[in-house]
Amino acid sequence: MSEEPNPMSSLWPLVRSGATDWLLELCGDGLTGFMPPAMPDAVWVLNSMYEHNQGSNEVSYDEHHRARLAAGSTQPRTVGAIDLDAVSVTTGGGLGRARHPGPGRRRLRWAELARRTGDPMVPDGLMPSHRCFPSAKKKGSWPLSMIPPTEGSLDRETWNQLIVTLSQCGPEGPDTRCLAYWSPLSLGATDFDNLHVRAGRLGDAELLYDLSGADFSPSNLWADDRSWVLCTDYDLWGTKIAGSPALIDALLNDPEIEAVRLPWAH
C-alpha cells in the first residue's frame, strides 16, 4: 500500500492490521466499523445538518430533480437498462465527508428539528440514520432548503471539536497515543484483507480527516490504552463514543457537539 507524502506518513504511519484484533474480539465484525459496547459508559455524537437561513422550503430534492428532468436540464440516471429515476427517490442525503456549507446556511440541531416536527431525535430501538425524521421529508425526500447529515463520516467541524474534547479529558492530553482504522468500504472496497490502520498523537488527529483515498473520517479512533473508542459506522448518521463517565459527561455538555444517550444502543 503506497504512503502519502508528509505529514501524514510521518505523524500517522501505517501499522499492522493486527492492531484491530482486540476490537474484533470486543465488537465482532468491523466491515462498517467496530461498534463498541459501553466502556463503561457511551454516548452518540450526531452528524451535523444544515438549513437555509430563510427557513424551510416545501420543494423536495426529488421534486426539484424531476422538474429538471422534465425541463431537459439534467440527464436521466441509468445503470445498464435500468432507469433509476423510475425506481428510486432523490432523498438529498449524501455519503462521506461534510462541512458547513458557508454563507446563507446555518447548522440545524437535531433537537430543534425534533421540536419542529414532533419526531423523536432518534426513534426507540433505532440508531441515528436515514430512518430518522420521517415527518421532515416528503415521500422520503428532504426539503431542498435542508442539507441532511451524511452517512459514514463525521462532519469536519464536529471531528475537530471531538479531538479538542478528547484531548482535554485524558491525562496525556494531546500527546495521547491513538490508533485509527478505516473500514474497507470507506476505501473503495478493494482490499478486505490488509486493514488500513495508523498510529499517532491525538493532537495531530485533525490530519486524519483528509486521508488520501478516503472520503470519510476514520471508522474507528481509539486510545492506545483502550480507555475510549470512537466508532463512525459506514451506514449511520452518528458516532458512538465509549469511555469513562467523565468523558461522556464532557461530550454531553460540549456546546459545539450535539450528543445523546441511546439506552437501547448503549
Residue ranges, per PLM feature:
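Alpha-helical oligomerization segments
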Residues: R226-H266
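Surface-exposed beta-strand edges and their flanking turn/coil or helix-capping segments
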Residues: S60, N194, D210-G213, G243-P245, ...
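Intrinsically disordered, low-complexity segments enriched in Gly and acidic/Ser/Thr residues
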Residues: T190-L236
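Extended, low-hydrophobicity segments enriched in charged/polar residues
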Residues: M1-Y209
